[in-house]
Amino acid sequence: MNKKLKYLSKSIKESFDINEINKIAKDSKFIQRKGSITAKDFLMFNVFYGSDICTAPLSQLAAKYDMIFSKQLPKQALDKRFNKYSVEFMKEIFIKFLYSQNNTLTNLERTLRTYFDRVIINDSISFTLPKEFKKKFPGSGGVASPSSIKVQLQYELLTGSFMNIDIFSGIKNDVEYLKTMKKYKDYKDLKLADLGYFKIDYLKRLDKSGTAFISKVKSNTSLYIKNPSPEKYKVGTIKKSSEYIKIDIIKLAEPLAAGETIELTDIYIGSKKELKSRLIITKLTEENKSKRIFNHIEGIKKKRLTLNQRRLDFNSINAYITNVSSNIITMNQVHELYSLRWQIEIIFKVWKSIFKINQVKKVKLERFMCFLYGRLIALLLSSTIVFTSKSIILEVDEKEISELKAFGNLIQYFPKLSFEIFKGEFYISRILKSVLSNFKRFGIKSKKNYKKTAFNILKLIKLESFEVTRFAI
């Protein structure tokens, strides 16, 4: 058996250890005495059969429970089990699985060695909830979204690991999450920063810690270059007001041809001028510019905001800042690497379209919370299987699998997996072999000549064999 598959089987077996699950159930007071619903059955029901917990009537859920476990359960009894203790139980299992998924995927031998230990993307997914949840999860306050939820994800691209998942109300801005992110230690990382998380102090902290970043630039960001001929006082000291020259990105891009890219080195960011980086500007083609402007105006209309001319003009360019040396990433590679952010959008598409995390009707809050943690646990388990399989297939067959296809195919195994997963390593290995075979037959990414895959783009920062040795010393 492939050693990665064997390691995965062992990891899943440990994660679904029945003794550990029962201990968590007792510690959380979910199980206080022997009853018709066991901790194992409740976990199985929420994780493997829970896509409709917040959409199906209780009578259907009770009927499904009977079909799966051969236990006739009144719908009122099932409803009572969705309580504060079951929420705590599911939350603790979720935390355990988050750690397990991180541990499993980060310990796999890398198929691709790069200049960076990790390539990290931060983003969030939001969706509207029934208005009854507005006390716990307040929304924007309007009629359309009195209640909404936001799930923040730190995603590591090289392994597929969900480094962290945090749950907030829908009114929490992405930039506020930077306070939470401070507690996570930075390694030799490359962070692809979205504008929602753009804060100069945060980028400055990354730079100071030795963490690499590529970030888009906001239209109102102050950018400066050192004045080559500053004014001086008679004593020879430089006049502070003339030490730097403010630059305008839009004006710099005006003489460029469509599709042309330029780079300015030693750019100072922000009014304090404490962060120095490279600035890369690309003038977009008329076609791309028109698409951007259309989407921008539609977004303004939808949110009922005031049109800002500078922000509108900014749609004619791509502008990035990075502290990565040009010896590692050239100016023409910066946009390609930043475009890897699309991978997290694929993950969120999986969350919504396949795991239906956003399909919530009016139910009691505890039922929703059990549903949410159940979906997240299912996603953690699935991502561990999918990304381990992806690594194996890339290594053995030199082919890439499509994450969308793989996740979609994997959930077809959930009914069988739900029972085999508690039987031990042999049974888990057997079903994982079947899943791997399925991915090889039906999950391979279709070739599109006009589009590079994520793996192709990551090769831009690949370490050659002689460099691996040098970096290890």
Swiss-Prot record:
It comes from the Bacteria. InterPro entries: RNaseH-like_sf, Transpos_IS4, Transposase_11. The keyword NAD does not apply. Signal peptide: none annotated. Keywords: DNA recombination, DNA-binding, Transposable element, Transposition. Disulfide bonds: none annotated. SUPFAM superfamilies: Ribonuclease H-like (SSF53098). GO terms for molecular function: DNA binding; transposase activity. GO terms for biological process: DNA transposition. Pfam families: DDE_Tnp_1. Involved in the transposition of the insertion sequence. Belongs to the transposase 11 family. This is Transposase for insertion sequence element IS1151.
